[in-house]
């Protein structure tokens, strides 16, 4: 073979390899497959670029892809990438109208502006609510999806892109008995010094609620998360998660739903470094001690509760 022939062959091989790598990357970064609901809506968030060794929390703004109101009794969320959390919010002001788009938003959304609807920390969540209990969505309403993808430490995003696909399954209006709401509990006082430590938050509600589900949330130093009922004096443990990976999303069976007047949660940490970690959004450099819970009945179609500990004071707010 001549020099030109050999060079041409090498060029062709390199070109083919490049094409194959591009095709492979394209295939890898498609959104995860999730069958669409027969009755309901599906929407996709992504791709969210994630640099090697970095993490990104991004907010994607869009409208519910349905002109009609939806009463949702079943939820599916499927994620690809190193997911730390995926949240879905609506604005407290029903007239808020943002242009579709996305931006970095490393901290939790402003609770005076946005209300949590759904939260997942797993690659796949399928959750059917008890009969007659639904999340209500207004047709075409403004929504925000907050996604936190990581490619460092205990989480990896091999393709360099994160995706989240949501399915909301519609229930006929005549079958709706109660509406569900979300509880966002957050300890902004959390401090994790070297060695072993823990942080506890206690929250009482203005009225008793029936718990549908709950999950705990911390960063890389977290080794155990417990949650329990709280009546202002004492309580009973109802949730325990050990380790960091795949925090359990505890669902209560329809015949075993607890009625609670409040919740308490404790995060236990082991910090093997000489650094002290404080509250903040980044998994490597900050810590969290958050609780996400879901309940019913609500006073209206869009009620949520926030419970925030800051400067030693716990503030509980019911948002309508």
Which ranges hold each PLM region?
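Bacterial N-terminal signal peptides
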Residues: 10-20
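Bacterial N-terminal signal peptides that target proteins for export
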Residues: 1-12
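Beta-strand-centric surfaces of beta-sandwich/beta-rich domains
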Residues: 28-210, 215-320
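Sec/Tat signal peptide C-region and signal peptidase I cleavage site
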Residues: 23-26
């Amino acid at each position: 073979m001549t020099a030109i022939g050999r060079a041409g062959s090498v060029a062709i091989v390199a070109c083919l390899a490049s094409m194959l790598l591009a095709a492979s990357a394209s295939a890898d970064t498609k959104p995860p497959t999730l069958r669409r609901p027969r009755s309901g809506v599906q929407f996709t968030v992504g791709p969210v670029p994630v640099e090697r060794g970095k993490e990104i929390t991004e907010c994607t703004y869009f409208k519910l892809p349905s002109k009609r109101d939806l009463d949702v009794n079943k939820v599916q969320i499927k994620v690809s990438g190193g997911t730390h959390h995926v949240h879905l919010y609506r604005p407290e002001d029903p007239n808020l109208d943002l242009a579709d788009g996305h931006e970095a938003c490393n901290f939790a959304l402003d609770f005076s502006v946005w209300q949590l609807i759904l939260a997942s920390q797993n690659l796949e969540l399928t959750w059917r609510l008890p009969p007659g209990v639904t999340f209500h969505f207004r047709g075409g309403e403004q929504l925000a999806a907050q996604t936190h993808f990581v490619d460092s430490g205990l989480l990896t995003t091999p393709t360099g892109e994160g995706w989240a696909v949501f399915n909301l399954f519609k229930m006929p209006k005549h079958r709706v008995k109660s509406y569900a709401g979300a509880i966002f509990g957050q300890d902004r006082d959390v401090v994790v010094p070297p060695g072993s430590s823990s942080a506890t938050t206690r929250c009482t509600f203005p009225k008793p609620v029936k718990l549908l589900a709950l999950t705990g949330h911390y960063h890389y130093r977290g080794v155990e998360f417990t949650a329990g009922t709280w009546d202002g004096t004492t309580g009973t443990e109802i949730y325990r998660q050990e380790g960091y990976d795949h925090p359990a999303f505890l669902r209560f069976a329809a015949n075993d739903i607890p009625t609670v007047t409040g919740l308490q949660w404790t995060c236990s940490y082991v910090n093997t470094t000489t650094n002290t970690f404080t509250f903040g959004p980044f998994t490597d450099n900050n810590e969290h001690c958050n609780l996400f819970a879901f309940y019913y009945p609500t006073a209206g179609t869009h009620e949520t509760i926030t419970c925030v500990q800051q400067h030693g004071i716990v503030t509980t707010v019911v948002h309508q």
